[in-house]
A protein has these predicted regions:
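Non-catalytic alpha/beta scaffold blocks inside enzyme catalytic domains
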Residues: 1-155, 179-318
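Short, conserved secondary-structure transition motifs
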Residues: 156-177
């Protein structure tokens, strides 16, 4: 796997005639996605709008997004990776065990029909959400989607894009990527970046209780992460920078109120297709910006002398 084949949301609006949502519920989580970019808008190469597009929804249960889809495929929980690898095998003309496919909750004929539709599309796109990336398989599921899309380009134009959560999640990934070469799951503990999802990912580090402190900026893991991770955050010195009270700030040792980016502080957010959007403040705030707080913390850390915990102190030779 050598990266992702992607595009902007504007290209999706103007070109995509075959749209797949996998492991997401955009009707609730991204209610304007359908009307602005994917289903209903009329594009340059899709002049009929909704009539010229086909939408497929893949999920483990029926959600409000089902009523907007043309095809709904209900996969058994934890079987997304098997479905993706089956689609890749069918794309390459490899033999597939029908009994194994049935374990995913889908018939082989259904997947054969899907892969043929994908190959015949003029411009296809897969939007994949946390129902795929945060279930069994995690980053391997994402890798399977990226590989499938790359291989589909031997037949037609196909792209993919993660459907991100709230806040500037894409921005954090983009900055991490151009500064370290990796988008997430990065450890700098040795003085240089190391990438290993599953080991250095935030959830995994917290669940294993590998860290003894936490600094959280503009996020609320206390509302979304597994309970073992939340319990660990509550048991260690946790510092939260956030303009409002959240589940995480309630369990933190320190909560520093900061100015709201885009309202009281300038900044840049990245859309889910990685397009940067500059933000200008419109109101004044008595609170410092996130950048100011981090800069002051960094200055104080620089003033501290080098130290080692007592457990790491050198033992004198006998």
């Amino acid at each position: 796997m050598g990266g992702k084949v992607t595009c902007t949301l504007g290209e999706v609006k103007n070109r995509a005639d075959f749209i797949i949502y996998w492991g997401g519920n955009p009707a609730d989580c991204h209610p304007l996605h359908f009307t602005r970019y994917t289903l209903t808008p009329k594009g340059k190469h899709v002049p009929l709008g909704r009539k010229g597009r086909t939408m497929v929804l893949v999920d483990v249960r029926e959600t409000p997004s089902v009523k907007f889809s043309d095809i709904f495929l209900q996969v058994r929980p934890g079987k997304d990776f098997e479905v993706l690898t089956t689609l890749r095998a069918l794309l390459k003309g490899r033999p597939v065990d029908e009994a194994r496919v049935a374990e995913t909750g889908l018939d082989l004929a259904v997947l054969q029909d899907l892969i043929e539709r994908m190959k015949k599309a003029r411009f296809g796109v897969i939007f994949f959400g946390m129902g795929l990336t945060m279930t069994r398989g995690k980053h391997l599921n994402s890798a399977a989607v990226l590989s499938l899309v790359a291989e589909l380009n031997a037949f037609t134009k196909f792209v993919c894009m993660p459907v991100r959560g709230h806040g500037n999640v894409t921005g954090a990934d983009v900055v991490m990527r151009w500064s370290t070469g990796y988008p997430f799951g990065v450890s700098l503990s040795r003085g240089y970046p190391r990438f290993n999802p599953g080991e250095f990912s935030t959830v995994d580090v917290l669940v294993r209780r590998d860290n003894d402190a936490a600094l959280i900026l503009g996020a609320d893991p206390g509302a979304t992460m597994p309970q073992p991770a939340i319990d660990h955050l509550a048991s260690i010195p946790t510092v939260v920078l956030d303009p409002k009270v959240t589940h995480t700030s309630r369990l933190a040792r320190v909560h520093i109120t900061t100015a709201v980016t885009g309202i009281s502080a300038p900044g840049t957010v990245y859309r889910m297709d990685e397009i940067p959007l500059p933000l200008k403040p419109i109101l004044r705030s008595p609170y410092p910006t996130d950048e100011e707080v981090i800069r002051r913390i960094r200055e104080k850390v620089k003033e501290m002398p080098a130290w080692l915990p007592a457990s790491f102190a050198a033992v004198p030779c006998a």
